[in-house]
From Swiss-Prot:
Cofactor binding summary note: Binds 1 NAD(+) per subunit.
Cellular localization per UniProt: Cytoplasm
Enzyme Commission number: 3.13.2.1
UniProt-recorded name of the protein: Adenosylhomocysteinase
GO molecular function terms noted in the UniProt entry: adenosylhomocysteinase activity
Similarity comment: Belongs to the adenosylhomocysteinase family.
Binding site for substrate: T63, D142, E202, K232, D236
Free-text function comment from the UniProt entry: May play a key role in the regulation of the intracellular concentration of adenosylhomocysteine.
Biological process annotations from GO: L-homocysteine biosynthetic process; one-carbon metabolic process; S-adenosylmethionine cycle
Record-level GO cellular component terms: cytosol
Record-linked InterPro entries: Adenosylhomocyst_ase-like_sf, Adenosylhomocysteinase-like, Ado_hCys_hydrolase_NAD-bd, NAD(P)-bd_dom_sf, S-Ado-L-homoCys_hydrolase_CS
Cofactor: NAD(+)
Keyword Cytoplasm listed: yes
Length: 477
């Protein structure tokens, strides 16, 4: 090993504090007992090494549960480089536990945006410093930032003017990072992108980006939409948020939720779980919706369906769950009660118009908890600066539900890497139903569930295979 390569491997990580590694390892061991899907996949595939030769760039919240995912990919033969997909979501002891084992991980809680985009670049560098080296051949993404970086960077190689007019602080930092990279290596993005077989995407927002690029004919590689696996969206998005939302609010504020009016913006899977959690603690839950079907669902569940304009001066707690921008705008916050709590559990920070508050006085109560003081002296409490409250102010979803999501991710990585000819470049796929059902089966024993088996006559009568899949793709669950 030459000196340059040796130096790269010896320093190929950036975490907050390596002394936290032992603590992180203890929590990883506990999480493994709660993640039967990933552990079963290790047992099934470790000897076969289906990911041998895979170089996986991972951009996903660097939590204890993610550490179990990373080590599952490695157990199946993959090389992995990892960064968080959110500046506040890293658990520093989890990152340290991976780093001391030799995993190149670049993440700390409370990153600057400049650091965030620097680290997102670093996870594409599998080769020795100072050489072209190898890039990844797989991306595991959450929110689509790693995928976006490759696509925007490649386009900017031909037209730097694409970077001339950033519309947010996030874009300002992203565009600056791309300009800096192109200044020293004008073909870096196209070289790295050319090696990528495909991407597996974790969340609704990232899938939306992929579908837009696919429809426009600009998606550079194959993609599997993990989010729309039933055992992801109907479990992680619903049951995960049902537990982690109130965990974040409680840790941040110690507020009594019972008796409060809580306004949940959006009634998709995340909104449903959030509304259930708040109602379980005896809040009066109101819902805002644009979709008449979702609005009717909320009403039939007993929630009051209102507009944000109606709720703004009446509710005590506001939660955005939509994946859209400007859901809570300045005029809404200006109308809110003194000490209203405002937070977001959608992927990006633009659901709440935080930028409109920058000219006001901010008083940090503690990390990720701020009083925003309006000119009339009124204060609202903003959590995680409008980013994911469950990861910014708490530790995210429980291990068990993340086992289901991450089992889908691992299976999707195996599918794309081992069978790329079955997937067209530029198209977005979901995993087939039998694999979705497999993920569910892997988790039944842990919760003590007993599965009824069809008889031959029953299977013939309803026209399904005895061992599944049991439902058509159109079934909504």
């Amino acid at each position: 090993m030459n000196a340059a390569v040796k130096a790269l491997h010896e320093n190929d990580y950036l975490v907050a504090d390596l002394s936290l590694a032992a603590w992180g390892r203890k929590e990883i061991r506990i999480a493994e007992t709660e993640m039967p899907g990933l552990m079963a996949i290790r047992e099934e595939f470790a000897a076969k090494q289906p990911l041998k030769g895979a170089r996986v760039t991972g951009s996903l919240h660097m939590t204890i549960q993610t550490a179990v995912l990373v080590e599952t990919l490695q157990a199946l033969g993959a090389q992995v480089r990892w960064a968080s997909c959110n500046i506040f979501s890293t658990q520093d002891h989890a990152a340290a536990a991976l780093a001391v084992q030799g995993t190149p991980v670049f993440a700390y809680k409370g990153e600057t945006l400049a650091d965030y985009w620097d680290y997102t670049h670093r996870i594409f560098e599998f080769g020795a410093a100072g050489t072209d080296g190898e890039g990844p051949n797989m991306i595991l993404d959450d929110g689509g930032d790693a995928t976006l970086l490759m696509h925007l960077g490649k386009r900017a190689e031909k037209d730097l003017s694409l970077l001339d007019n950033p519309k947010s602080e996030e874009e300002t930092c992203l565009y600056a990072a791309i300009r800096a990279k192109l200044a020293v290596d004008p073909t870096w993005y196209s070289r790295k992108g050319a090696q990528i077989i495909g991407v597996t995407e974790e969340t609704t927002t990232g899938v939306h980006r992929l579908k837009e690029m696919s429809a426009a004919g600009t998606l550079l590689f194959r993609a599997i939409n993990v989010n729309d696996s039933v055992t992801k969206s109907k479990f992680d998005n619903l049951y995960g948020c049902r537990e982690s939302l109130v965990d974040g609010i409680k840790r941040a504020t110690d507020v009594m939720i019972a008796g409060k009016v809580a306004c949940v913006a959006g009634y998709g899977d995340v909104g449903k779980g959030s509304a259930q959690a708040l109602r379980a603690l005896s809040a009066q839950v109101w819902v805002t919706e644009i979709d008449p079907i979702n609005a009717l669902q909320a009403a039939m569940e007993g929630y009051k369906v209102v507009t944000m304009e109606y709720a703004a001066d009446k509710a005590d707690i506001f939660v955005t769950t939509t994946g859209n921008r400007d859901v809570i705008r300045h005029e809404h916050m200006a109308a809110m009660k003194d000490q209203a709590i405002v937070c977001n559990i959608g992927h990006f920070d633009n659901e709440i118009d935080v930028a409109s508050l920058e000219g006001y006085e901010w008083d940090e109560i503690k990390p990720q908890v701020d009083h925003i003081i309006f000119p009339d002296g009124k204060k609202i409490i903003l959590l995680a600066k409008g980013r994911l409250v469950n990861l910014g102010c708490a530790t995210g979803h429980p291990s068990f539900v993340m086992s289901s999501s991450f089992a889908n991710q691992t299976i999707a990585q195996i599918e794309l890497f081992c069978h790329p000819d079955g997937y067209d470049v530029g198209k977005v796929y979901v995993l087939p139903k039998h694999l979705d059902e497999k993920v569910a089966r892997l988790h039944l024993k842990k919760v003590g569930a007993m599965l009824t088996e069809l008889t031959d006559d029953q299977a013939a009568y309803i026209g399904v295979p005895k061992n599944g899949p049991y439902k058509p793709d159109t079934y909504r669950y």
